[in-house]
């Protein structure tokens, strides 16, 4: 299922990241490393997101009650496909070059 509005407000996502309530999947961290970013760099990208970077929201394949917000910010290295899930904290699910 998809929708064109964020499931979680960007201000809430940034608040959680600023509070250190963020984690990442191994694959997202490895992909970010290929772009020259470490975990702190990934968090900085999220803090720098704007509403115009939003692309879509979608449910996970395994559980249609869990929503993932997809952003496509433009970095110096190019455009990034960034997928996050917010339940109790921010989980960076995907972070790769688009």
From Swiss-Prot:
Tree of life domain: Bacteria
EC number(s) recorded for this UniProt protein: 3.1.-.-
Record's keyword annotation contains Iron-sulfur: no
GO molecular-function terms, A-Z: RNA endonuclease activity; RNA endonuclease activity, producing 3'-phosphomonoesters
Regions crossing the membrane: none
Keywords: Endonuclease, Hydrolase, Nuclease, Quorum sensing, Stress response, Toxin-antitoxin system, Transcription, Transcription regulation
Keyword Acyltransferase included in the entry's annotation: no
One GO cellular component term noted in the UniProt record for this chain: toxin-antitoxin complex
Induction field: Induced by amino acid starvation, glucose starvation and when translation is blocked. Also induced by nalidixic acid, azolocillin and H(2)O(2). It has been suggested that MqsA represses its own operon. Induction is decreased in the absence of the Lon protease suggesting, by homology to other toxin-antitoxin systems, that Lon may degrade the MqsA antitoxin. Transcription is activated by MqsA. A member of the mqsRA operon. Most highly induced gene in persister cells. Degrades its own transcript. This operon induced by ectopic expression of toxins RelE, HicA and YafQ but not by MazF or HicA.
Biological process (GO), any one: negative regulation of DNA-templated transcription
CDD domains found in the cross-reference section: MqsR
Gene3D superfamilies: 3.30.2310.40
Effect of a null allele: No loss of ability to form persister cells in MG1655, represses persister cell formation in BW25113. Deletion decreases biofilm formation in LB medium. Deletion has also been shown to increase biofilm formation. Deletion at 48h, in flow cells, leads to a reduction in biomass, substratum coverage and changes the biofilm architecture from a 54 micron thick film with microcolonies to one with nearly no biomass and only a few colonies remaining. Deletion abolishes motility.
Temperature dependence: The MqsR-MqsA complex is exceptionally thermostable with a Tm of 83.4 degress Celsius versus 48.1 degress Celsius for MqsR and 61.1 degress Celsius for MqsA.
InterPro entries: MqsR_sf, MqsR_toxin
Quaternary structure note: Might be a dimer. Also reported to be a monomer. Crystallizes as a heterotetramer with MqsA, MqsR-MqsA(2)-MqsR. Purifies as a possible heterohexamer of 2 MqsR dimers and 1 MqsA dimer. When the 2 dissociate the MsqR mRNA interferase becomes active.
Job description of the protein: Toxic component of a type II toxin-antitoxin (TA) system. Plays a significant role in the control of biofilm formation and induction of persister cells in the presence of antibiotics. An mRNA interferase which has been reported to be translation-independent. It has also been reported to be translation-dependent. Cleavage has been reported to occur on either side of G in the sequence GCU. Also reported to cleave after C in GC(A/U) sequences.
Descriptive protein name: mRNA interferase toxin MqsR
Gene that encodes it: mqsR
